[in-house]
Amino acid sequence: MLGSPLLTFPPLDEGILVKRYKRFLADVELVSGEIVTAHCANTGPMTGVLHPGGRVRIRHAPSPKRKLAWTWEQAEAPSAQGGLCWVGINTALANSLIRAAIEAGHLKQVLGPIAAIRAEVTYGSNRRSRIDLFLTPDANCSDTRPIYLEVKNTTWIEDSLALFPDTVTERGQKHLKELIGVLPESRAVLVPCLSRHDVQAFAPGDSADPRYGELFRLALTAGVEVIPCCFGFHLDKITWEGLRPTKTTQS
């Protein structure tokens, strides 16, 4: 059901973004006036969602294994429909979101019934890469080929079109080539994790990385499946907002 909670958690702390620096760090002023430093898992340019002085949400999770007790989870950004929209910027969360969506049955119509899910399985020509999720279909599935599934957290939009990537990504280009490489013995699936509820479709970010756009279209022609999944981000939960169509070009 659209709008149903997929992940729930204790309420996040809200604050104001002071600055993001050294790629991994963000200073946030809490409601109390205290300024804390949070880990930023998104090391890219964060096009359209990085707004010093804007509202953000961070999670407090102190641990002796972590240098920082805070993690930056969400940012408030201009919405495609006007007003503001909360965006999930923690790239480390995307795989868990897609896995939860599969386990909840939200992708059954496109993937078929799934018997098992494994994470970070080695693959590729030199077996040096790791696929985000490796799916084993149910024995009763009409297509019993194993599924290699790559997840891409997507936060950049133009109008209501979600775009990935927002910068040149040689790693992302490599992932497309490796997905093509598992065909036809296996299914190859690219899942853009649309981490904001205000998008209507997905396309490759040609203006940011023209080569990625070329490889994206080559992958589609080769048989790679693209399944954009949309989510809503809230203070204490993330909701399922359904599938979105794919466009082959940004323009």
Swiss-Prot record:
It comes from the Bacteria. One of its GO terms (molecular function) is DNA binding. It holds the Pfam family SfsA_N. Signal peptide: none annotated. InterPro entries: SfsA, SfsA_C, SfsA_N. PANTHER family: SUGAR FERMENTATION STIMULATION PROTEIN A. Belongs to the SfsA family. NCBIfam families: sfsA. This is Sugar fermentation stimulation protein homolog. The lineage of its organism: Bacteria, Bacillati, Cyanobacteriota, Cyanophyceae, Synechococcales.
